[in-house]
Amino acid sequence: MKFEDKLKARSREDVWNEYCGFLDLSMDEFVQIQNRLMEEQIALWSRSPLGKKILKGSTPKNIKEFRGLVPLTSYDDYASDLLQKKSELLPDEPVLWIQTTWEGGKHPIKVAPYTESMLDTFKRNVCACLLLGTSTKRGDFKARSTDTILYGLAPLPYATGLLPLAFEEEIGIEFLPPVKDAVKMSFSTRNKVGFKLGLSKGIDYFFGLGSVTYYVSLSLGKMSSGGGGAISLLKKSPLRFAKIVLAKCKCIKEGRELKPKDIFKLKGFMVAGTDNACYKDDLEELWGIRPMEIFAGTEPTCIDTETWSRNGLYFFPDACFYEFIPSDEMEKNLADSSYQPRTVLINEVEEGMSYELVISVLKGGAFMRYRVGDMYQCIDLKNKDENIKLPRFKYLDRVPNVIDIGGFTRITENSIDQVVKLSGLKITNYIAKKEFNHNNRPYLHLYVEMDPHAQITQAISIEILREQLSIYFKYVDQDYQDLKKILGIDPLKITIIKAGTFAYYEKNHSHKIKKINPPTLEINELLTIQDQDYRVEMGGRLYE
């Protein structure tokens, strides 16, 4: 029976329990589900050519043996098979392949296979998100098959394109604009058409990357303030036209700009991706409803969601088997790639600790003990206020050696090296840090040291450096280009470091400063060195 039919035929309590009942599980019950599904997955995966290749002849009999035999994996371990879409090597037949960016400057894309069972689980869990997204308390929801949703997503083959597919098969929610039309439109056109349709039909849901929904929300406010389409709207929906007129009058009286909440009353608002914490307060102010955060990705599918209180994430028990690398273990591994970090299970996490997530995709998935590249913090082990007995998590960011801005970029040391090389600029050293401005918006801060000869012979200003490096970031990383095209921002800030500063730092310390996201304390120390009198030898010459 489809989700839509269940909403009509069953009691609200039955529907809630079927989709959101995982929130009533005890920790032991959650672990039992995890273990049962993982044992099934191990048996399936171990028999596949892909599994045999990674296991190297070993045959694990249980989860403990599996964790001891199978090393932590990355996409490099699967690339040769998955990029060629060799279905015959997989644990189960994929019915769909999802695509995303791998690493700018080195690998263009990575793909992930989805089995029918994985898609069934995905559909069930996004329906749970739909119920939770409209809820204000346990068991309460407002989802209807006649609802509308503003289309703010990337289409297939990207992971967000699965949402319209899932809803199409489960519930007749109307996308604005319709998916078949939206996929052919530019981002700007899609916003304008969706907004015009929303004015006449109303908007019940909004879902997208936090950064994108913020940009779209600002655009809606500006479009609402304009007069375009007023006559058409008056003919189609006189009541909605009157509501807009009254809203504009109210805003003029209060001396403020028109906001989406003045026109629309959302039932549910969901955001995904990174940096959502930077936008949620502003989005709540714009729409009058706090966004509910979920986490979904190309490899892991939809794995966790907030609840009616919008104050922490809970993992679904049936999407992946979860392991967690403690942050100190992760740091040891980043410093020494030969070091094998230990993992803990979900019933072993500690309150207040931060972890790198490791997943094994259930239901015939390809990825096992896979490092997704995302960081979580355990807020608490149980939520007494909501009577939830499961660990509650906060999404932090990507792992420290990757800089993600607004859910778009995957900037690494390799991609920056490529940019520097292609630019031809005489940059001898750099560090890159994800920082936040006074509005809590993320940006990429590059601290660069120029060749002293170049500084003498070339009139290189910070602005010229920024412009040239931006050009090559857009060339190396398509997602970086989308930041400008979709969000209208160029997140690059440049600080020029005096020649010899890095060498002086290394001379007086037992280590080199990390190139990607070094500690703020070390950056401040580097900047302090510039104000000191020092001499350092570079290329056989002394500089001071």
Where are these regions (language model features)?
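Active-site diphosphate/adenylate-binding microenvironment
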Residues: 36-98, 106-120, 127-144, 158-162
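Active-site-proximal glycine-rich helix-loop-beta segment
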Residues: 104-107, 374
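Function-critical acidic carboxylates
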Residues: 101
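Redox-cofactor binding/interface segments in oxidoreductases and associated redox assembly factors
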Residues: 87-90, 151, 208, 271
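Active-site glycine/GP-rich loop and adjacent strand/helix microenvironment
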Residues: 1-51, 81, 165-544
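Short amphipathic alpha-helical face segments that pack within enzyme cores
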Residues: 121-128, 215, 415
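Conserved AMP-binding loop of ANL adenylate-forming enzymes
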Residues: 132-173, 181-183
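Amphipathic alpha-helical surface "interface" segments used
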Residues: 60-70, 148-152, 490-495
